[in-house]
Design a protein with these regions (language model features):
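Active-site neighborhood of divalent metal-dependent phosphoester bond hydrolases
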Residues: 1-52, 56-84
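Conserved catalytic motifs of the protein kinase core domain
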Residues: 39, 110-112, 157
Length: 194
């Protein structure tokens, strides 16, 4: 995953600014559960270990099997489920997350949807079947938000990748913003030199 650019930039910082940045980063959450009128969303950097998530929920009385999903899980239980996820998975997972449904949505499309990034949508084809260049907007040729799953959940995707390759720079990259209340997408291109 590199990190060399970040490392170089951190090395170039004044020590006090570096310390302040590290202190601030330590206060940031690894995950969040937010609710809209329609459903809860699990916000994580990279994804979740779905088998561990379903096992935790089952231990706490929510059986996701047979198309039931995690409909019975309230916000507090979803927070607890995320709290026991490995921080490595929350920050780095790809295989085992993008390539299979989460099992958290019911057959009717009810339950929590996972929103994550870390994997640029232009690279999703390495980790799952997304069909062609789903991660590239045909008109602009830049990264775009991709919704995955839905085949067994009444057309409702169970995973949303919002990493539109901003870190790759101006050729493909842009910032993607997803408004959860209505699913509206907004984009800001990365310009040369940014």
């Amino acid at each position: 995953n590199g990190g060399w650019t970040t490392r170089e930039q951190l090395n170039d910082m004044e020590f006090e600014a570096y310390e302040e940045l590290v202190r601030w980063m330590a206060t940031l959450p690894l995950y969040a559960v937010v609710e809209t009128e329609e459903r809860p969303y699990l916000l994580v950097h990279a994804g979740i270990q779905t088998e561990a998530a379903r096992a935790f929920l089952l231990e706490h009385g929510v059986d996701c099997a047979d198309g039931a999903g995690a409909v019975g899980a309230d916000r507090e239980l979803l927070q607890q489920m995320l709290a026991v996820q490995s921080s490595d998975d929350l920050l780095w997972i790809r295989h085992g997350y993008w390539d299979a449904p989460t099992g958290l949505l019911s057959a009717e499309g009810k339950g929590p949807v996972v929103v994550s990034g870390h994997t640029p949508t232009v690279s999703l084809g390495r980790y799952c079947e997304v069909g062609g260049l789903a991660g590239l907007d045909e008109e602009s040729g830049r990264g775009q938000i991709v919704r995955l799953g839905g085949e067994d959940t009444a057309g409702v995707p169970d995973r949303i990748d919002i990493d539109c390759a901003a870190a790759t720079g101006s050729e493909f990259g842009r910032v993607g913003i997803l408004r959860l209340d209505d699913g509206a997408e907004f984009y800001a291109n990365i310009n040369p030199g940014e």
